[in-house]
Amino acid sequence: YIFVYGRIPGYKNNRRPQTMDREPPVSVVVPLFSEDYSFVEERLPLILAQNYPDFEVVIVYVGHDSDFYEDLARLKQSFTQITTTKIQLDPRFPISRKMALNVGIKSAHYECMVFTSTDAVPQTDRWLSLMAKGFMRGEIVVGYCGVERRKGFANYMMRTGRMMQSAAWIARAVQRRAYRGTLHNYGFTKRIYFGANGFSHLNMNIGEDDLFMQRVMTRDNVSVILSPRATLREKTWGGMGWWMSQLRYY
């Protein structure tokens, strides 16, 4: 146990050799699958307020509400970092998360991209800065996302379960045997993505943070960002029943 997990507390990504001499501009890609005003009003501002000089936020809206999309696009008047794109929702042709990410990647203006979800909340304004710094030492960057702290035993079990699940793949990553990340907090370059011909099985709603990552991760191209200032917390939408439904992604 100590041999496998004991390296996590002392791991420092800055021991790895640099491949860039400065932090790159970054595109933050966020797929949005509903008319989620709580994301727009509460969590999006935390992304836009990141303490980083050169970044954009690419929001891929999957839906059919033209008024909502116009409100979303209008935000660019106040926040020039925002780029929006829309995929028209058609019940006959379901749109997977990987399809939305594929559109977001093609819409991104920068080579280095960080991916998150509408449910994830940055814990500090240094999150993006630290994730971007990871690209100086690897073309793939993985970070941690916990579960928001709330009252109750169910929430305690959720937070503990997330920590244990994440410790398994983080331990392998710091040993230079990375095999996955978390869909709420990871990144890679366009060169990595298009060099691997993108996601496979675009119609499947799983695999972007594990199956794809297994194809492109090597011993030398992964940066692991473990600073508490670079963590996110996932918003919960229910109790243990909701949590068990989320475990299918692990």
How would you name each of these model-derived features?
Residues 1-20, 172:
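N-terminal membrane-anchoring/stem segments of glycan-assembly enzymes
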Residues 24-27, 56:
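Cell-envelope/extracellular polymer assembly enzymes that use nucleotide-activated donors
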Residues 44-91:
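Acidic donor-binding segment of Leloir-type glycosyltransferases
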Residues 62, 116-119, 144:
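Active-site acidic Asp-centered loop
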Residues 84, 88-96, 100, 104, ...:
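Long helical/loop segments within the catalytic core of UDP-sugar-dependent glycosyltransferases
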Residues 113:
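Short aromatic/hydrophobic "clamp" motif used to bind/position activated sugar donors
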Residues 118-133:
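Acidic donor-binding/catalytic loop of UDP-sugar-dependent glycosyltransferases
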Residues 140-142, 146-165, 194, 199-250:
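Catalytic donor/gating beta->alpha subdomain of glycosyltransferases that bind UDP-sugars
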